[in-house]
């Protein structure tokens, strides 16, 4: 998909986010809006998915660990259906994605797993345990993305608990 088409999809997803959160009278539009470009790019340019066959066995998988970005995810899913996992508390999605990637690798499948995390949830120890497992098992079929927007529900990350140089970690 070219840049103009991606921009059009991003604008529509942003409209969907605002409509969903406004109509619900609830939600976290900021955390969804900060994830739009990354999620749209992954679904439309990097993942192997077929909207006509969303349960295809050989499709790639996506795990949204950053649950506050669910309205963004729903906006993307309107055109590219298929939820591979529902996550609970922040930090659990990374472990789920590692398990999916390891399972695919052990079964010899050509499946890639993509996980989107929020930078605030990277303060959770479970994230780092999952990432150590991914490195140990050499999960080259796993892509973990962090929406590094500098904010979480309690304030700025630096005020709550600085992550330091996240890219270096």
Description of each model-found segment:
Residues 1-70:
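N-terminal amphipathic, basic-rich helices that act as targeting or association modules
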Residues 49-55, 59-61, 80-169:
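Glycine-rich ThDP/TPP pyrophosphate-binding loop and its adjacent helix/strand module
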Residues 72-79:
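Alpha-helical support elements that line or immediately flank enzyme active sites
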């Amino acid at each position: 998909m070219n840049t103009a088409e991606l921009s059009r999809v991003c604008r529509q997803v942003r409209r969907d986010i605002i409509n969903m959160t406004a109509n619900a009278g609830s939600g976290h539009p900021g955390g969804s809006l900060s994830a739009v470009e990354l999620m749209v790019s992954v679904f439309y340019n990097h993942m192997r998915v077929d909207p006509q066959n969303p349960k295809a066995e050989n499709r790639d998988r996506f795990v949204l660990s950053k649950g506050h970005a669910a309205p963004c995810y729903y906006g993307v899913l309107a055109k590219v259906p298929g939820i591979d996992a529902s996550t609970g508390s922040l930090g659990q999605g990374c472990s789920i994605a590692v398990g999916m990637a390891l399972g695919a690798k052990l079964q010899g499948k050509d499946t890639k797993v993509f996980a989107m995390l929020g930078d605030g949830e990277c303060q959770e120890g479970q994230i780092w345990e999952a990432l150590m497992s991914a490195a140990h098992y050499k999960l080259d079929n796993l892509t973990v993305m962090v929406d590094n927007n500098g904010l979480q529900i309690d304030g700025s990350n630096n005020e709550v608990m600085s992550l330091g140089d996240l890219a270096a970690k």
